[in-house]
């Protein structure tokens, strides 16, 4: 029997949110679908989030929960129509239809807790790209070991671009994915945040966020020199240095003989 925490704003009992729970022997506690609810609520084996309504708010809640370093599986409950809105960046471990039967619910809960136990020793998820590292667990980003002082949205924007290196996103796409469906500001917001991000990356690394004219932005992966090319250059430099060293004694001897000849002719 597992300890389940159901986050919901519905005034219905848990068996109305997910009827199959009424046929299973798990211990279910209910709390408001808000981030602070976790502070006043004891830990759980699995957190269930009621996403049958208000998907933009629930998406933000799931991302917030994941950003706090949540150590237990996060399972989203949605209607069949809500499945189309769910993507990987929600930060959830699994998704359940509210009409799922008890056998399916039991299997998914068992798999979610099993994966958590198997992966319990894994380090927090970190995105590495060249000199840049983005730690989703601590919401921090480092460039050559230097911690970047980023706002929440600057971090989210950098993380999203770094997760998809080379892929071009329009301003509208970034606005939807980073700011959310419920944001009603203009795409100019994206330009402002990109400009601030580049300033914080510094002149040497501002090109990590590339502009695709008349389209949008992309994360540019730093190019690494080919091993063969690097070794060829090293060999050429080494040969040139050896030749210069071999030539130097000859030049010195010639200059000495020339000077001696000049003195004897004067005499």
Swiss-Prot record:
One GO location term (cellular component): cytosol
Keyword Cytoplasm: no
Gene Ontology molecular functions: phosphorelay response regulator activity; transcription cis-regulatory region binding
DNA-binding residue intervals: 124-221
Signal peptide: none
Region (Disordered) residue spans: 220-267
BP terms from Gene Ontology: regulation of DNA-templated transcription
Residues with 4-aspartylphosphate modification: 50
Compositional bias segments (type: Low complexity): 252-267
Pfam families: GlnR_1st, Trans_reg_C
Keyword check for Nucleotide-binding: no
Biased composition (Basic and acidic residues): 221-248
Top-level taxonomic group: Bacteria
Keywords, ordered alphabetically: Activator, DNA-binding, Phosphoprotein, Transcription, Transcription regulation, Two-component regulatory system
Disulfide-linked positions: none
Cited function: Activates the transcription of the glnA gene.
UniProt protein name: Transcriptional regulatory protein GlnR
């Amino acid at each position: 029997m597992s300890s389940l925490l159901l986050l919901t704003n519905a005034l219905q009992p848990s068996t109305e949110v997910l009827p199959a729970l009424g046929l299973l022997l798990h211990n279910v506690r209910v709390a408001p679908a808000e981030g602070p609810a976790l502070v006043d609520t004891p830990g759980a084996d699995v957190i269930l989030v009621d996403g049958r309504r208000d998907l933009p708010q629930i998406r933000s809640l799931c991302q917030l929960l994941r950003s706090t370093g949540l150590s237990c599986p996060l399972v989203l409950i949605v209607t069949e129509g809500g499945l189309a809105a769910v993507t990987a960046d929600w930060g959830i471990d699994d998704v359940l239809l509210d009409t799922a039967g008890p056998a399916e619910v039991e299997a998914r809960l068992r798999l979610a807790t099993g994966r958590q136990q198997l992966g319990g020793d894994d380090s927090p998820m970190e995105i590495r790209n060249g000199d840049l590292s983005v730690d989703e667990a601590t919401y921090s980003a480092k460039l050559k070991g230097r911690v970047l002082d980023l706002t929440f949205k600057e971090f989210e924007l950098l993380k999203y671009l770094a997760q998809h290196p080379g892929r071009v996103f329009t301003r509208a796409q970034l606005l939807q994915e980073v700011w959310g469906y419920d944001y009603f500001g203009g795409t100019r917001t994206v330009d402002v945040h990109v400009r601030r991000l580049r300033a914080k990356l510094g002149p040497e690394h501002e090109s990590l966020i590339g502009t695709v004219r008349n389209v949008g932005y992309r994360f540019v992966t730093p190019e690494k020199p080919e091993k063969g090319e690097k070794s060829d250059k090293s060999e050429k430099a080494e040969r040139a240095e050896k030749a210069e060293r071999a030539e130097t004694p000859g030049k010195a001897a010639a200059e000495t003989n020339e000077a001696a000849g000049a003195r004897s002719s004067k005499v």
